[in-house]
Amino acid sequence: MATPTQRTPIQIVPHFSRLQEWIALDEGFFQDEGLEPMMLADVMHAVSSHHGDEYKRRPQDLPFVQQMEVVNSACQWGTACNAGAEMGKLVPDLYTVGRFAIFSRPGSKIQRLVDLRDVPIGIGERAGSHFTTLQVLEQILPKKHIRTVHTGGPGERLVALLRGEVEAANLLDPEIAIAEARGLRALARGEFLITFWVGPTIDKGVLKAYFRALKHANEVLSLTPEKYMHLWERNVPPALQDNYDYSAFGLGEKFVFEPYTEEMFQNALQFAEKWNLHTYIQDNTYDNLISVTGI
């Protein structure tokens, strides 16, 4: 194994809805690949806990606005739109599948999605919760009766729900498990694609090593999940820390080591355009916005 001075530094924003980055760190998989990981957990918690910052001022945007060489993830729509808005690039070699769920606040009379007609739903603007809420509700409600409110990150959305500040909100992992533990009612559940969102100047060899480490972490998580469930504690934002049964939190995002194709990319952009969420895009050419690693 290379010594710390021989390893290549890499700045990683752990994704709050999975464990693979933490497993790779604790098991030494990054180091085995010649990397010296800098885990930006403060950014992860800021993403989860922000109160509704504007686009390009959100915590997830700032590393890219500041031109840091960072590795992050976002929903497929977000990564595509962000890359098109000159914030990072999309890695097309793989993707993950995450969970979302729309919950109502404690004591709410809302029991079904149809009850959300003209009811503001807490989301993170131009992020996975926003796009998935629109996808779900457009199937049963006229567009003019779908309401969303930019409540902030997923941790902040659950805090707002528990305080009764919003009638309903879209949550991700680990907030889904926390909401369930606190007895909140789920109105809808689903899954969505998450893609890797990286600084445009990161060396391809460094990215390839990073993904090899994540693949190794994914393999050991699949083999002995019970060994790693305690790591969810690291992803719970400070405002929601408690003594949870982390064995009930599940495995988080599922990795799919298959290409995120141009067709998938264009479909994501078309959905964003349908809801007028494409307005920051300067370039929508797939080949210009991807960073191929060849894993």
Residue positions per predicted region:
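Conserved C-terminal helix/tail region of periplasmic/extracytoplasmic solute-binding proteins
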Residues: 273-295
